[in-house]
Amino acid sequence: MYQFLEQTVAGHMTRTVKTVTRGLTMRDLGDMFERDDFNAYPVEDDRQIVGLVTKFDLLKCFAFTPNQMVPRYDDLMRRTVADVMTPEFIYVRSDTKLTRVLQLMVEHRFRSVPVIDSGHRLEGMIAREDILRALKACIGRSAG
C-alpha cells in the first residue's frame, strides 16, 4: 500500500484524449456523450485547454424555473460549448501524486481530471478507473 503513496499521474493517465472546441453545438456534444462513455471533455482552442464541459453542463441547458419561458428544443441544441463550459476548472500535472488526485475526486465528486502541462496544453486525463487500477496493483504487490 505504501507504493501507492509514491505513484504519480504520469504512470496512470490516459494520454489519448478526445477534446471539443468552443463552437461545437449542444446537439453534437450530446451525440458525443452518447457515443463515448465519458463524463467530460476538455475544451481546446489553439492547442491550449480553455475549459471543461461535462454532461452536467449539457443537462443544465434544460433546467428552467417555473417563471421562465421554456425555449424551443432546437434553439437549445444550437447553443455552443462556449455557452455552457466551465472556463475555470481543476486540473493536475503529470507529477501530481495519485493520493492528491484521489483527494480531489472525493472532495469534488469528479469522475476524471484533466492533466495539463505548464503551457496549458492537455497531456491526458486521469479517471477514477485509473486510480482504482493503481490501488489494486499496489495492494496486489503488497499481499503477494
Would you name each region that the model predicts?
Residues 1-16, 54-90, 97, 102-106, ...:
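Tandem CBS (Bateman) regulatory domains
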Residues 20-37, 43-44, 91-109, 116, ...:
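The conserved cystathionine-beta-synthase
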Residues 33-36, 41-57, 105, 113-130:
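A glycine-centered beta-loop-beta connector
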